[in-house]
Each structure stands twice: as C-alpha cells, then as structure tokens.
Amino acid sequence: MSSVAKVPLYERPSDYVFDMTTLNSADAKRLWRAAIKEAWNNRCAYCGATPITNNSLTIDHVRAKSRGGQDCTSNVIPACRRCNQEKASLEWVAWFRLQPFYSIVAEWRIREWLRTGEVPAFDSDEETAVWFNSILSEAV
C-alpha cells in the first residue's frame, strides 16, 4: 500500500529549495501552493466552496501584490477562481463583508491563518461557538 507524504508548509516558496525538498523554484512554488490548499482542505477560504478541479482553486494574495503584498504564507489564502477575481486588488475585509456568503467565523479563520499559519478546525457548531467566544473574550 503506497502512502502520499504530506507536504510541509513553509512561509515562502524559496524555503522548499533551501530545505532541499526540491531543487528548482517552479517546483517550490507548486509545493507551497499545494500545502496551503491542503491546510484549508482544498476549500475556498472566503465562500467555503470545494472547487471541482485543483486549477479552479487559486491562491489569493490577501494584500495584493500590486499594493506591496508578498509571496508568503502570512499573506495568501486559497480562493476559488470566482472569489479571487471578484476581490481582485481590493482590501479583503471590506470586500468580504459585502459578500452574500460572508461569515464572521470565516473571517476569523482567515485572520487566524494570517496570524499563525494554521486554520482552526471544527467538528461541530458547538466547537465553533466555543472557539469564537474565546477569540471575542481575548479581544475585549
């Protein structure tokens, strides 16, 4: 039985070359993007959609590259092609809060990812509520 090794998630694509996971930058970027998508269970961070093909799940720069955003894990999230194109170079929170699929829980998941590089995982609505209440109590 063959098993597929989980790709580690590094802060930057170049870290895959430095760690000798790969020897070229194109493979490094591909591995980095795959690890980000895998961390989010191959779902759009904004609308939660699971795209039909891997190509339709893109990587969105939360702070657009045109506004100085970098290629680093703390600035990118997986987004379906539709969300990525609609957001374009807009400020993510302002854009996201105007969407019909907006969710405060999704916003806080994105914020946690940008802060820590980890996606809070929940098995139930109760677990989500407990986590969200802990975030709110920390903010107060």
Where do the model's predicted regions map?
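A detector for short metal-coordination/catalytic motifs
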Residues: 74-75, 82-140
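Histidine-centered nuclease catalytic patch
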Residues: 48-78, 87-99
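Short, cysteine/histidine-rich loop/knuckle motifs that typically chelate Zn2+
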Residues: 46-47, 82
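Generic detector of intrinsically disordered, low-complexity, polar/charged segments
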Residues: 45, 65-66, 103, 114
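Short, charged surface segments at domain edges that flank catalytic/cofactor-binding sites
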Residues: 2-46, 111-123, 128-136
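Polar low-complexity intrinsically disordered regions
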Residues: 1-2, 79
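Short, charged/polar micro-motifs that form catalytic or ligand-binding hotspots
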Residues: 34-37, 66, 70, 82
